[in-house]
Design a protein with these regions (language model features):
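Non-catalytic signal-transmission and effector/linker regions of two-component phosphorelay proteins
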Residues: 1-14, 119-132
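Short hydrophobic/Thr-rich beta-strand motif most characteristic of the beta2 strand and flanking loop
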Residues: 34-41, 49
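Charged docking surfaces used in two-component/phosphorelay signaling
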Residues: 24-32
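Active-site beta3 strand of CheY-like receiver
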Residues: 53-59
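Receiver (REC) domain active-site loop signature in two-component systems and cognate sites
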Residues: 64
Length: 132
């Protein structure tokens, strides 16, 4: 399959995570499954990438600089022209009481506590009807 055809048919994922190591791990995992991955180091970059590329899935860390994950989710949910609605998985290493509820109320579809196993992510994505 040519690169241009692969780019048309391969689902696109935005990984919004300020930890380079976590971004790279998620990028490799998705690329091995044939997904195109766009990386964002903060919420502002994630919003810009989402606006420009209209991804099929967004993974967003809740604790990021410039625009935190909750605000990123709210902003994406308010955008016109994104995949209707693009699935969003919120991730956090700083789980506190009420955080999951706040993320769901902001508009995420799933919630993961870091560190997590990639099988846990796969289960969440399958539950959303996303093929992994």
């Amino acid at each position: 399959m040519s690169t241009s055809v692969a780019a048309i048919v391969s689902p696109m994922v935005v990984v919004a995570e300020d930890s380079r190591d976590t971004r790279q791990m998620l990028k490799r995992a998705f690329e091995l499954k044939g997904y195109r991955v766009l990386e964002a180091q903060n919420g502002k970059e994630a919003v810009d990438l989402t606006r420009t590329f209209k991804p099929n899935l967004i993974l967003v860390d809740l604790n990021m600089p410039e625009l935190d994950g909750l605000e990123t989710i709210r902003y994406v949910r308010g955008m016109k022209g994104t995949q209707d609605p693009v699935p969003i998985v919120a991730m956090t290493a700083f789980h506190v009481y009420g955080m999951e509820q706040a993320a769901l109320e902001a508009g995420c579809n799933e919630y993961l506590i870091k560190p997590f196993d990639l099988d846990d992510l796969d289960k969440k994505l399958k539950g959303l009807g996303f093929i992994v």
